[in-house]
Amino acid sequence: MNTWKRYIGAAALILGLAVLPHCGFGETTAVPEVRGIVLTGEAKQAYIKTQMDALYCPPEDKKPASFTAPEGWAYEKTSIGNVPVERLAPPKPTAKRVVLQLHGGAYMSGLTDLYRTFAVRQAAYTNAREIYCVDYRHAPVYRYPAALEDATTVYQGLLARGTRPSDIIIFGDSAGGNLAVALAIHLRDKGLPQPAALILLSPWADFEHKDGTSRTENFAKDKVLGEGTPFAPHLRSTPLYAGDLPLDDPRLSPGHTDLRGLPPMLIQTGGYDLLLTEDEQLAAKADDTDVTFTVYPEMPHVFPLVLPELAESIAACEEMRDFVDHHMPR
C-alpha cells in the first residue's frame, strides 16, 4: 500500500471548516484544535530564516544551555557492542516500544543536543519505553560502511538483550534517514528480523546532486540546507562518507535499489525541502511496501527537528504517533 498525502496548513484548515456550516453540509463541524505557531507565506519564511540564523550563529548571550533530561527521566551514556549510545527513558512507560534514533548531519557530525531534545519528544509521541540515540562513526575519519556497521551492531545488541523486533521503531532524519533505510535493507538481505516500522524525516535518498530537481528548484527556499546556510557551499561536493563508491551505488543511494520486504515506513518532507525530489522518488520506489508519504507545504528540511514550535512540526509529530499506533497496537 502506498499512501501519498499533502498536509493542509492549519490556517487553511480552520478557514475551510469555518465556512462548512454555510455550504449545506448540515450539522456544524467543530474546528479542530490547532497546536503551535501558525504562520503563512512571507511571514512564515521570515520567521524560519530568523530561527535558522540564530541556530547556526547564536549570539554569545543566547547560546542554549546544555541538554538536561526532564525530571524523572533516566538518561545514561553507555555503549552497545562498543558503539556509543545514549539512552533516554520516561519515568512511567506504558508500552514496550523502543526507538532507535539515527541522527542526521551528512555523515559528517556526531550526536548533538538538538537530537537529545528531539528524542524526548519522540519518546513522548511514540509512547516509547526507551529511546537509544546512536553516536555512529562518521566522515571524514570513517567512510562507508562504518555507520551501517554501527547501526547494525546496536540493533542486534537490542535483540540480544531481549527486545523484540516487533517493538522497535527505527527513526532517521536526513543522513540518518539514509542510514535507517540502509539498515533495513541490510537486515532483509541477511535474513535478520525487521523492526516494526521506519520513520524517515527528510531522508537523504540520493548521494548524487542533480540539477533540475528540488536540489536546485528549492535552493533559495530551503532555509535549513539551501542558500545562505552553512551547508550551501558543499551541496555539489562529493560526500566524503561515500569513499570510493560511485554516488549512484544502491548502498549509498537507496532510491536506486529494491525496497521490497522492508517494514512499514512513514516518509515526511517539506514542500521547500532541498531533498523533496529524491524523497518522492524513494516513496515511489517503495510502492510494494506499506509506505505513507506526506509533504508539508512551504516547510524546509527536517522542520520538526529544528522548528518544533510551528504548527506543522507538531502535526508531523502527531502523524508519527498515529502511524506508530496504527502499526504497533498497544
Predicted features by range, described:
Residues A30-Q51, L55, K62-R330:
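Alpha/beta-hydrolase superfamily serine-hydrolase fold, recognizing
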Residues V19-T29:
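Bacterial Sec-dependent signal peptides at the C-terminal "C-region" and cleavage site
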Residues M1-A11:
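N-terminal Sec-pathway targeting helices
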